[in-house]
UniProtKB/Swiss-Prot annotation:
Pfam families in UniProt: UQ_con (PF00179)
Protein name, as recorded: Ubiquitin-conjugating enzyme E2 6
Biological source species: Schizosaccharomyces pombe (strain 972 / ATCC 24843)
Function: Catalyzes the covalent attachment of ubiquitin to other proteins. Functions in degradation of misfolded or regulated proteins localized in the endoplasmic reticulum (ER) lumen or membrane via the ubiquitin-proteasome system. Cognate E2 conjugating enzyme for the doa10 ubiquitin ligase complex, which is part of the ERAD-C pathway responsible for the rapid degradation of membrane proteins with misfolded cytoplasmic domains.
Active site: 87
Predominant location: endoplasmic reticulum
EC number of this enzyme: 2.3.2.23
Pathways involved: Protein modification; protein ubiquitination
An annotated GO cellular component: endoplasmic reticulum
Single GO biological process annotation from the record: ERAD pathway
Protein keywords: ATP-binding, Endoplasmic reticulum, Membrane, Nucleotide-binding, Transferase, Transmembrane, Transmembrane helix, Ubl conjugation pathway
GO molecular function: ATP binding; ubiquitin conjugating enzyme activity
Cytoplasmic side: 1-206
């Protein structure tokens, strides 16, 4: 249960976030427990997470802001283990380095910055850039199909996620046939379609010449007979 100080501080920070949101981040407390916050990070552009939607939690101690929160990410990202406490300088792994003047917005900005770095930490995983991009494409499907807490905390995003998923599927369906029909013609097929390079066309040309010669000789004899 939150102390009066923690409750007052977290409510103040929530109102501040509503007034001045953090770029690429949405965050709010659970209605039944102000110490349990849920965040959504929108994958920053020009990163392997672009277009992704990453849901996670901040679990604050009852005596916040004097101690830092536990930070977890629920949506698979290829960057962090899911549902695992992350070792960050502003998380509960490092209470001695925590500064009580830091706020929820400070934590969220730091989390986005760390996520897009290559720094290794407890709770982090190492994957390729292509793997992270693959995860990013699947985040919205995961959140509405395999993440019940997301449905509770962010119901306003459900329909939008479904629309985005349907749109992505439609675009993929359009791209695949184009790729199939754009298969280049092989050199052998090109040669088959070049009439003057085929043996059959050469034979036809020889027969045409022979016929012309025959008619020329016949005409010569005909006119010679008349003379």
């Amino acid at each position: 249960m939150a102390s009066k100080g923690a409750y007052k501080r977290l409510m103040k920070e929530y109102l501040a976030l509503q007034k001045n949101p953090v770029e690429l981040v949405d965050a709010k407390p659970a209605t039944e427990n102000i110490l349990e916050w849920h965040y959504i990070i929108t994958g920053p552009p020009d990163t392997p997470y672009e277009g992704g939607q990453y849901h996670g939690t901040l679990i604050f101690p009852p005596d916040y802001p004097f101690k830092p929160p536990a930070i977890r990410m629920i949506t698979p990202s290829g960057r962090f283990q899911t549902n695992t406490r992350l070792c960050l300088s502003f998380s509960d792994f490092h209470p001695k380095s925590w500064n009580p003047s830091w706020m929820v917005s400070t934590i969220l900005v730091g989390l986005v910055s760390f996520m897009t770095s290559d720094e290794i930490t407890t709770g982090g995983i190492v994957t390729s850039e292509s793997t992270r991009r693959t995860y990013a494409k699947d985040t919205k499907r995961f959140n509405i199909m395999d993440n019940p807490k997301f449905l509770i905390m962010f119901p306003e995003l459900i329909d939008k996620n479904r629309e985005d998923i349907a749109k992505a599927a439609a675009e993929a369906a359009l791209i695949e046939p184009q790729q199939i029909h754009s298969t280049p013609v092989s050199s052998n097929e090109c040669k088959k379609n070049e009439p003057f390079n085929s043996k059959q066309s050469w034979v036809k040309s020889r027969w045409s010449i022979a016929v012309l010669v025959f008619f020329a000789l016949a005409l010569a004899r005909f006119f010679g007979a008349d003379s």
